[in-house]
């Protein structure tokens, strides 16, 4: 798993942020960009990658095929597919909704997003990349 870019993909509440923190704790040189799409267009992620920084990024929107394809194309052009590793959380909406309800962060609409994304989250989307599948955090 010593690639420059680790992308963690899963539904809200799957454990993406928790896993990124675990990965970073094992390699202090690896930076985390949580929910990276919201800040992608300020150039920070690409500047870090261009500077050869090791990143662990995540965003639940990567469960959507069109969103994943848009961003993976950019990353492949910049650092090459061989420098990218994916960690996919299983598509387990019930456990994710349980986790969301128990984290008490008062974000609105997340349970609906879990349902919407789970209907479109297809592991086959990622099959041409090096990846592993993890169980949802319990």
From Swiss-Prot:
Record-annotated residues binding ATP?
35-42
Among its keywords, does the record have ATP-binding? yes
**A molecular function (GO) term:** ATP binding
Q: Which domain of life is it from?
A: Viruses
Keyword check for Nucleotide-binding, yes or no: yes
Entry keyword set: ATP-binding, Nucleotide-binding
The protein depicted here goes by the name Uncharacterized protein R277
Source organism of the structure? Acanthamoeba polyphaga mimivirus (APMV)
Q: What is the lineage of its organism?
A: Viruses, Varidnaviria, Bamfordvirae, Nucleocytoviricota, Megaviricetes
């Amino acid at each position: 798993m010593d690639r420059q870019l680790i992308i963690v993909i899963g539904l809200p509440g799957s454990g993406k942020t928790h896993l990124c923190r675990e990965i970073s704790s094992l390699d202090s040189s690896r930076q985390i960009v949580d929910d990276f799409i919201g800040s992608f267009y300020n150039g920070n992620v690409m500047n870090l990658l261009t500077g050869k920084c090791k990143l662990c990024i995540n965003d639940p929107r990567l469960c959507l095929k069109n969103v994943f394809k848009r961003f993976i194309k950019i990353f492949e052009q910049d650092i090459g597919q061989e420098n990218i590793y994916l960690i996919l959380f299983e598509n387990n909406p019930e456990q994710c909704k349980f986790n969301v309800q128990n984290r008490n962060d008062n974000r609105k609409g997340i349970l609906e997003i879990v349902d919407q994304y789970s209907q479109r989250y297809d592991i086959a989307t990622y099959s041409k990349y090096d990846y592993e599948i993890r169980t949802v955090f319990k």
